[in-house]
């Protein structure tokens, strides 16, 4: 776990350092055209924690959890050039872990709404602030969705406000996706930043997992539009959250079933009823093709 955190921390800094350097040297028009408003910073890191790391009434402090462990090096590097905030939401996977009992799919929707609200509020208050978006696990799925909306021009802020996006263990990762979709092995700087710092970042050498995210296939569809090259989608090989076998639709069926259910260990009867309800709709969503492909012949 320690080595993984070190790699992710290094990767996260790689995504954000071009914006930090631009802010510090006052060469990025989008960042440095005017002094930041009171209480603002040239760069705002907005993080969405993973399952079990936050709750409906959780803290907005981004110093703990996986994201906290990788944001701290950036804060140490950049000092007053950055601020950060966590987006709390019901992250208990239907009650399976701490964080709430809202079914996973509903909590993802809640997280998306709260992330959009946070970005809108900060952008309205801080005219000259750039953003780095970061998400871990379930939080990465939330950030992935909003990043795609921003890149396609339908998000809460414009794409030129986003310095970088870091997705860690993303359940919405496309199968075989490179670490930096649209860019390859290193991120790209903002087109008008005037910074060449990104050219000094060594290529990211970790192997590219050939699987994809375990989340609903609809969530992995689409691209990042204008944010292509500024998104880092980091996945450790073998991590089922982001490297599930791409040729096994049944994996998505099981995830879809769990994602619609309340999984309260103290209420097995209620859990069973919730799973039964989800199973009814999941059977329709899955379709007979899944049964034909994955539950037939010698596979039983």
Locations of regions flagged by a protein language model:
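Short beta-strand element of the alpha/beta-hydrolase
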Residues: 43-50
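Surface cap/lid and interfacial helix-loop subdomains adjacent to catalytic sites
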Residues: 36, 47, 56-95, 110-121, ...
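Second-shell loop/turn segments in exported
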Residues: 53-60, 100-107
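Low-complexity, acidic Ser/Thr/Pro-rich repeat tracts that form intrinsically disordered stalk/linker regions
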Residues: 31-43
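Phosphate/oxyanion-binding active-site loops and adjacent basic polyanion-contact surfaces
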Residues: 104-115, 139
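Short coil/turn segments at beta-strand junctions that form active-site/ligand-binding loops
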Residues: 41-42, 127-130
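Gly/Ala-rich beta-loop-alpha elbow adjacent to hydrolase catalytic centers
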Residues: 133-148
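Secretory targeting and sorting signals
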Residues: 1-34
């Amino acid at each position: 776990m320690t080595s993984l955190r070190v790699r992710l921390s290094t990767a996260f800094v790689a995504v954000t350092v071009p914006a930090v350097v631009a802010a510090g040297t006052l060469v990025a028009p989008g960042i440095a055209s005017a002094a930041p408003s009171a209480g603002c910073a040239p760069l705002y890191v907005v993080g969405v924690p993973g399952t079990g790391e936050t709750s409906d009434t959780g803290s907005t402090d981004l110093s703990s959890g996986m994201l906290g462990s990788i944001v701290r090096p950036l804060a140490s590097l950049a000092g007053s050039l950055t601020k950060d905030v966590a987006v709390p939401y019901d992250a208990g996977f239907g009650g399976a872990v701490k964080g709430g009992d809202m079914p996973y799919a509903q909590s993802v929707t809640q997280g998306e709404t709260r992330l959009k609200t946070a970005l809108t509020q900060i952008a309205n208050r801080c005219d000259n602030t750039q953003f780095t978006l970061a998400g871990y696990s379930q939080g990465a799925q939330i950030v992935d969705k909003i990043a795609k909306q921003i890149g396609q021009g339908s998000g809460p802020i414009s794409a030129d406000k986003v310095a970088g996006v870091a997705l860690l263990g993303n359940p919405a990762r496309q199968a075989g996706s490179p670490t930096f979709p649209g860019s390859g092995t290193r991120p790209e700087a903002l087109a008008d930043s005037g910074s060449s710092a990104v050219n000094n970042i060594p290529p990211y050498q970790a192997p590219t997992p050939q699987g994809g995210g375990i989340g609903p296939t609809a969530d992995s569809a689409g691209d990042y539009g204008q944010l292509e090259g500024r998104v880092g989608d980091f996945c450790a090989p073998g991590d089922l959250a982001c490297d599930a076998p791409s040729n096994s639709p049944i994996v998505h069926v099981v995830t879809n079933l769990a994602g619609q259910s309340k999984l309260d260990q103290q209420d097995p009867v209620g859990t069973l009823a919730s799973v039964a309800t989800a199973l009814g709709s999941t059977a329709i969503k899955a379709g007979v093709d899944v049964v034909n492909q994955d539950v037939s012949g010698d596979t039983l």
